[in-house]
Amino acid sequence: MAIERTLSIIKPDATKRNLTGKINAKFEDAGLRIVAQKRIHLTKAQAGVFYAVHAERPFYDELCEFMASEPVVVQVLEGEGAIAKNREVMGATNPADAAPGTIRAEFAESVGENSVHGSDAPETAAVEIAYFFSGLELVG
């Protein structure tokens, strides 16, 4: 498998419960390296631009409000098959469907407050990483 990079966001429900370290440990235990990371507080407008792909979905406004409600941790993960590996470590979007030991099974509070976001494809990862990080900030 090729070395890839993917974007991960530790969402407000997890940052407000001080779960960043526990979530990062799960990424690292799975063989993913954190090559860039920062804690930021998104505005609703910034969240709206990031999640623009969902603009026509009924949950869009609630998602943007939630993502702007508390700080988030944005990070770039790197490793072999990083996109698929990250999605495996995160678990299913609905925590009730997430496999035991995954981030969402252990930490998510609901489908909407599911603790983490991860890119779903190489093209998406490139766009999402560029939204939050300059090339100088990627120090893999």
UniProtKB/Swiss-Prot annotation:
One record GO biological process:
CTP biosynthetic process
Q: Which InterPro entries match?
A: NDK-like_dom, NDK-like_dom_sf, Nucleoside_diP_kinase, Nucleoside_diP_kinase_AS
The annotated active site, in chain numbering, is: H117
Reactions catalysed, semicolon-separated, are:
a 2'-deoxyribonucleoside 5'-diphosphate + ATP = a 2'-deoxyribonucleoside 5'-triphosphate + ADP; a ribonucleoside 5'-diphosphate + ATP = a ribonucleoside 5'-triphosphate + ADP
Q: Cross-referenced SUPFAM superfamilies, in alphabetical order?
A: Nucleoside diphosphate kinase, NDK (SSF54919)
Question: Which residues participate in ATP binding?
Answer: K11, F59, R87, T93, R104, N114
This protein's major location comes to: cytoplasm
* Swiss-Prot/TrEMBL keywords: ATP-binding, Cytoplasm, Kinase, Magnesium, Metal-binding, Nucleotide metabolism, Nucleotide-binding, Phosphoprotein, Transferase
Cellular localisation: Cytoplasm
| EC number, as in UniProt | 2.7.4.6
Q: Which superkingdom?
A: Bacteria
Could you name the Gene Ontology cellular component terms for this entry? cytoplasm
Q: GO molecular function of the protein, one example?
A: ATP binding
Matching SMART domains: NDK
User: What cofactors does this protein use?
Assistant: Mg(2+)
Q: Relate the protein's function as given in its record.
A: Major role in the synthesis of nucleoside triphosphates other than ATP. The ATP gamma phosphate is transferred to the NDP beta phosphate via a ping-pong mechanism, using a phosphorylated active-site intermediate.
Q: What family does this chain come from, according to its entry? A: Belongs to the NDK family.
Q: How does it assemble?
A: Homotetramer.
Output this protein's name: Nucleoside diphosphate kinase
The UniProt gene name for this protein comes to: ndk
